[in-house]
Amino acid sequence: MRKSGCAVCSRSIGWVGLAVSTVLMVMKAFVGLIGGSQAMLADAMYSLKDMLNALMVIIGTTISSKPLDAEHPYGHGKVEFILSMVVSVVFIVLTGYLLVHAVQILLDESLHRTPHLIVLWAALVSIGVNVGMYFYSRCVAIETNSPLIKTMAKHHHGDATASGAVALGIIGAHYLNMPWIDPAVALWETIDLLLLGKVVFMDAYRGLMDHTAGEAVQNRIVEAAERVPGVRGVIHLRARYVGQDIWADMIIGVDPENTVEQAHEICEAVQAAVCGKIRRIESLHVSAEAREIGDTTKPSFSDQPLSFDEVMLSKVDN
């Protein structure tokens, strides 16, 4: 990691998020009940979601950081995607229920009430805290490339946005004499929660399906490899995410006149260059094939998973 404090933050982010989200959830639920705000009660669901996600971060990062073993040659990184999917499914179900409830209140004018101004102050506190937590968790997510911590950052961003909507709704209800705004904001929040749950679910689904590391990452790998002296281009590259880490293998072109030992030295130099250039590469296996000067064939990309033998070989090579 780039800074010495990053390791400390990555270990504490889950506990900090859990404590903050628990306090916010209790505050929002209490204020929503005594202040008569449906929007604030729905906003409490954002903090409950954040709280559960923080628990998933604590559990997931603990398990995913375990070393490789014979039964798990790819490591334990996918547990983060599994837990992200569980959280998303739970909230899609819960917010579906809240959506129906919000529609019922919005359509029944007898249930429209102007919330107490204490709700406005609670919303402002929530905005400030969640903006701070968003930047904190986003920084950790960038350093660790953890899907769970990325999800945490998204959740805090959504929570801050929702609290902002609650604040605007309270202002509208009080100063524009529009008490229906509060249940309308509650309806918007539930729809937003559903959409957020869908995004998290699809991200977790792609992770479980061994999605490719992406063209941008693959191009950076190729660029780093082709800068190594003796490399005559990258012939084939296969890279994918396993949890927060990248597993890849590549075939490079070398001079047909090179000895086996010389080709092996070039492969080792490529490994060092690529791993030094691109963070989060857990495994990189490099092999060489003869390639004549002037062959400008572009590298082929593949997202097919490595075999068990290839995985164990690449770990030995690294």
UniProtKB/Swiss-Prot annotation:
Residues at which Fe cation 1 binds: 249, 285
Region described as Transmembrane domain (TMD): spans on this chain: 1-210
Effect of residue 250 to P: Severely impaired magnetic response, cells make very few, small magnetite particles, less MamB and MamM protein accumulate. CTD no longer dimerizes, CTD has cannot fold properly and is unstable
Effect caused by changing residue 9 to S: Wild-type magnetic response
Record-linked Pfam families: Cation_efflux, ZT_dimer
Source organism superkingdom: Bacteria
Molecular functions per Gene Ontology: metal ion binding; monoatomic cation transmembrane transporter activity
One CC-aspect GO term: plasma membrane
Alphabetical keyword list: Biomineralization, Cell inner membrane, Cell membrane, Ion transport, Iron, Iron transport, Magnetosome, Membrane, Metal-binding, Transmembrane, Transmembrane helix, Transport
Gene3D superfamilies: Cation efflux protein transmembrane domain (1.20.1510.10), Cation efflux protein, cytoplasmic domain (3.30.70.1350)
Induction of expression: Part of the probable 17 gene mamAB operon.
SUPFAM superfamilies the record matches: Cation efflux protein cytoplasmic domain-like (SSF160240), Cation efflux protein transmembrane domain-like (SSF161111)
Chain ranges passing through the membrane: 13-33, 39-59, 81-101, 117-137
Effect caused by changing residue 46 to H: About 90% magnetic response
Binding site for Fe cation 3: 289
Annotated consequence of substituting residue 260 to G: Nearly wild-type magnetic response
Binding site residues for Fe cation 2: 264
Remaining remarks: This bacteria makes up to 60 cubo-octahedral magnetosomes of about 45 nm in diameter which contain membrane-bound crystals of magnetite (Fe(3)O(4)). Expression of just the minimal mamAB gene cluster (MGMSRv2__2365 to MGMSRv2__2381), including this gene, is sufficient to form a minimal magnetosome chain with small magnetite particles.
Designated name of the protein: Magnetosome protein MamM
Protein source organism: Magnetospirillum gryphiswaldense (strain DSM 6361 / JCM 21280 / NBRC 15271 / MSR-1)
Lineage: Bacteria, Pseudomonadati, Pseudomonadota, Alphaproteobacteria, Rhodospirillales
Annotated gene: mamM
